[in-house]
């Protein structure tokens, strides 16, 4: 291995996960501990949770962290599913101070997309590709010929009279007691809207529900235009951790 493993940390609306990553192969080389996202998810409380996970993994000389919001030059510009006090926060500075090593910060869906385009379902694909992460909310990452268009936040588009993630996120299926088929149709309609906007050749569906893609794939296939391929994420919900580590290693 030409480079030491790098710690990637994926901060979500409900949980924070971390692992050591072999960034040459895109593989986790440690356990993947998880802690509940503190509520309220303020910067200091989240940073403390991240530090607990990093300490448990033995630390690293450089660490990558994702956050669910728009990130520009290390500063959080919007806050989705975390406390509003993140807005305007120098997240790079916060995590670097808390952990005592250099840290990089990237939008969570962008991180997952980078990992899938490098090691997973999008590997070697040109044209327009979209990664959609379905969890507490909906995250997105858009790529053109393999190049990331950062901070798209397509889960915040208006869809059927409300914010899209309030209609079709994975958390909505549980909260509204939807069957997989009912929820799959919602996702299919949402993805169809994205095909109208971007005409992607590929849509990668990520998040924990990617493990159960076959439960709602037929509903998606019945709605999304045939010229757009829709596939589950190969890295499943490991993608955010791997992408965070890639960025920390300077490879994006």
Residue ranges of model-derived segments:
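ATP-binding/phosphotransfer module of carbohydrate and carboxylate kinases, centering on a glycine-rich
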Residues: 1-62, 71-75, 95-103, 115-130, ...
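A charged helix-plus-loop insertion that forms the helical arch/lid used to bind
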Residues: 76-88
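Extracytoplasmic strand-loop-helix segments at the start of, or within, the mature domains
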Residues: 138
């Amino acid at each position: 291995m030409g480079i030491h493993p790098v710690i990637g940390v994926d901060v979500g609306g409900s949980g924070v996960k971390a692992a050591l990553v072999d960034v040459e192969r895109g593989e986790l080389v440690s356990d993947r501990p998880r802690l509940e996202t503190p509520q309220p998810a303020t910067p200091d409380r989240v940073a403390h949770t991240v530090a607990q996970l990093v300490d448990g993994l033995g630390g690293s000389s450089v660490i990558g962290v994702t956050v669910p919001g728009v990130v520009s030059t290390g500063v959080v510009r919007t806050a989705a599913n975390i406390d509003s006090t993140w807005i305007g926060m120098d997240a790079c500075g916060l995590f670097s101070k808390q952990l005592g090593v250099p840290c990089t910060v990237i939008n969570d869906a962008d991180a997952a997309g980078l990992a899938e385009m490098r090691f997973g379902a999008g590997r070697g694909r040109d044209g327009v590709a979209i990664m959609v992460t379905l969890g507490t909310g909906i995250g997105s990452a858009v790529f053109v010929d393999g190049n990331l268009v950062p901070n798209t936040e397509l889960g915040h588009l208006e869809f059927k009279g409300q914010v899209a993630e309030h209609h079709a996120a994975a958390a909505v299926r549980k909260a509204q007691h939807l069957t997989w088929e009912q929820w799959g149709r919602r996702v299919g309609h949402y993805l169809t809207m994205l095909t109208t906007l971007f005409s992607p050749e590929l849509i990668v569906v990520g998040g924990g529900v990617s493990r159960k893609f076959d439960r709602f794939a037929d509903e998606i296939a019945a709605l999304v235009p045939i010229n757009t391929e829709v596939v589950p994420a190969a890295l499943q919900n490991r993608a955010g951790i791997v992408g965070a580590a890639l960025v920390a290693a300077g490879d994006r």
